[in-house]
Amino acid sequence: MKYLVDTHAHTIASTHAYSTVHDYIAVAKQKGLKLFAITDHGPDMADAPHFWHFVNLRVLPRIVDGVGILRGIEANIKNDAGEIDYFGDYLQELDIVLAGFHEPVFPPSDKQTHTQALINAIESGNVDIITHPGNPAYPIDITAVAAAAARCHVALEINNSSFEMSRKGSEANCVAIAKAVRDAGGQLVMGSDSHVAFSLGEFSQALAIIEEAEFPEERLLNKSPEALLTFLSKRGHKTLDDFAEL
């Protein structure tokens, strides 16, 4: 099956990434993608865009040349309380909120601290998707996190970049996560974590993890624009009718 949705992409607004919104649209068209999310790093990262970047995402058109653009963020989990670096009413203006651990904001600690931070972020209601939870630098209680995510209708990400450019050693953790989410009745999403447009929609290694875990496709958010948009709508995002024509 060809997957037409990517929830995780960074633009030049995050200065360690190298592509513009226009670049991503062009690649999405070339590859036949129907929907992708702009999710630059939250403002607590050293080279992240200013807070205003996320507020002003509303200027982006919803659909360009048949490609839908979700206005999002990859927020930073800041502490074991699960707080993120974007807040309040501004969260409601975004279409999608990703959050994860990043070493400049939350240095690795211990399994109990990491687990509590993720569960608190999941239970906060502020986060739709937890990014790269299989990072071996941040060991977690996988069963507990998967159960919390399923209970709170938060998706966990299988991050394709973790097997290519960063977070080496994620494979075994990600297989365990996929199996735990499968058994808990939760949802997964594959994210390219693109930092250059050429990798948008690239899921080959993440898909191998999904298949090894025998994860049911009906609970994989990439399977269609409708699957992701329905998930986001159920999580309280109000402005998604604009994508009805996709």
Curated annotation (Swiss-Prot):
Its EC number is 3.1.3.-. GO terms for cellular component: cytosol. Zn(2+) 2 binds at residues 16, 41, 195. GO terms for biological process: bacterial-type flagellum-dependent swarming motility. CDD domains: PHP_HisPPase_Ycdx_like. Zn(2+) 1 binds at residues 8, 10, 74, 193. One of its GO terms (molecular function) is zinc ion binding. SUPFAM superfamilies: PHP domain-like. Binds 3 Zn(2+) ions per subunit. Keywords: Hydrolase, Metal-binding, Zinc. Its cofactor is Zn(2+). Zn(2+) 3 binds at residues 74, 102, 132. Belongs to the PHP family. This is Probable phosphatase Ssed_2939. It comes from Shewanella sediminis (strain HAW-EB3).
